[in-house]
Every structure is written in C-alpha cells, then in structure tokens.
Amino acid sequence: MSHVYTIGKYLGHEGSEMLIDAAVKGLSGAAKDKENGGWYSSITPDGGHVDNKLCYVHAFVILAASGAALAGHPKGEELLQDALDTYDRYFWNEEDGMACDTWNTEFTELDPYRGLNANMHTVEAFLAAADVTGDEKYRMRCGRIIKHVIGWASDNEWRIPEHYTSNWEPDLE
C-alpha cells in the first residue's frame, strides 16, 4: 500500500503524505528486525512476529522505500538503502540471476524452495529502485529474471511454472 500512497501524493490526494510517513514509521519500527536485520513477514496480534524472512516482503519494502524517497520523505533514502543492502545480502543470487525465497528469522537457514512470485515482485521493486537511485544494475537484474522466465515458459508450452527446486528446476507438481 505504501507505493500507492506515493502515487496518491503525485495525483494530489490530500492526506497521502501522512500515509507515507506512517508507512515509513512502521517499516522502521515494529516491522523491522533490529536484532537480525531485515523485516518480519508478519506481526502477530500479540506483538510477536512470524518466524521467517520472505523475499516477497523485502521486495515490497524496497518498493515502499522507493516511493517514500521519490516523495521526498526525510527517511526515504535511508530506508531504501537499508532495504537494498539487506536484499543484496540475503535474497539476490548473482550467480543464478534470480532471488531466493525464504530464510529463517536469523538469516542462518535458507529454505530450498524457489518461486517466481517473489521474483515477479522483485522486478517491480528493482524497477522502482532504479528509477529512484539511477543505478542501472537493478534494471539489468530485471532483465536477467525476465530472460529466465521466458526460457522456462518456452520449455513448458508457454505456461510459466511458479515453483522450483533450489537448483531452479521447475517443480510442476
């Protein structure tokens, strides 16, 4: 939703800046894992958190932070840099040219599952990050993800598999 608030600001919707600020505060506060880094996948009603770190969530933090930076929020650029650094450290795999999916909370155990949903949202986030930072490596990464997806689709009668093994072999079951 944070990205939508940025769009709202540029469309002139009153109150959008207040919503951007609330999003930045949430991402810098309760949603942020100050002990292990990164962001919690979910906050429970009792104030706890779900015990994992999802690529999907971190991509959305990049998207939200990109919007906040674009909107001129005073902490937007700092949040974006933190999100990109965390993503690069834990989720982006340069060798594969794809993102991994799920870590435990401490970032010590990587789940073998690989999925396209997280990579789809990574493309969205990286395009926004490239627009805000001017760093073209994020567009290049998007191209690598897209090239993989086109290859898998062409090998599967133009149907795009969503689930993969740790070696990026389609899991069609």
Q: Which role fits each region the language model picked out?
A:
Residues 2-173:
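Glycan-recognition and catalytic cores of secretory/periplasmic carbohydrate-active enzymes
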